[in-house]
Amino acid sequence: MPLLAALLLWVLFGIEQGYGLDFSSWGILPRHLSGLKGIVTSPFIHGDLEHLANNTFPILVLGWCLVYFYPKVAGRVVLATWFIAGVWVWISARPNYHIGASGVIYGLAAFLFFSGVFRKQRSLMAISLFVVFLYGGMAWGVFPILPRVSWESHLWGAIVGVILAWMYRGVAPAHVPEPIVLEDEEDEEAPSSAPPRRLHVIYHYDPGDEAPEHPRTDLASDAEPWWSDHDHT
């Protein structure tokens, strides 16, 4: 699925550039009825080659992580991030066309990161750290620093991703081993903390008799008063 999504973005961009078209009017135009269609179409539209290239790799990596580790909810996470974030961008963002898949990307990154945090599993926390390692700099994208960057899309995508991570925290991830909990059984003996027992040797003969060739060896209990001077190893 991530590969097909990335391929579709490149095909649409190639059509736009090849035929000299301008798809930017299919982005989200906040608080305009004509801009509502952008909630559906805006993730497919990119301003230039750099914009598209910057979004392609995160779609492949984060999309693969989502599908591999959370296949049960992957589709719902993508669609919810796509549409809910898009609606809030239409409601609250600046009155310009907002285009690009970065809102969905921020949603996936936030979902993957906070899924590990909320579940408190080491294996899933490794995914969170992986996301931070690759895309930790994305955090700055939710602030209005660059005027031509839709930080509103980034912000709402991240917010939706966090909410979804909390909502689906009870869904078991795939390909990640569940924590193993060992339960005590009633008939199972507890490990003994007593020190190792030592051996004592009893010679069943009178001092005046000739010693037997092989003495009898018994295990001494704690109640017996005699102990040998050496541990049996």
PLM features per residue range, with description:
Residues 1-206, 224-228:
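A detector for small-residue-rich transmembrane helices and their helix-helix packing motifs
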Residues 206-212:
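Extracytoplasmic/luminal low-complexity segments enriched in Pro/Gly and acidic/polar residues
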Residues 212-233:
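Soluble, non-transmembrane domains of integral membrane proteins
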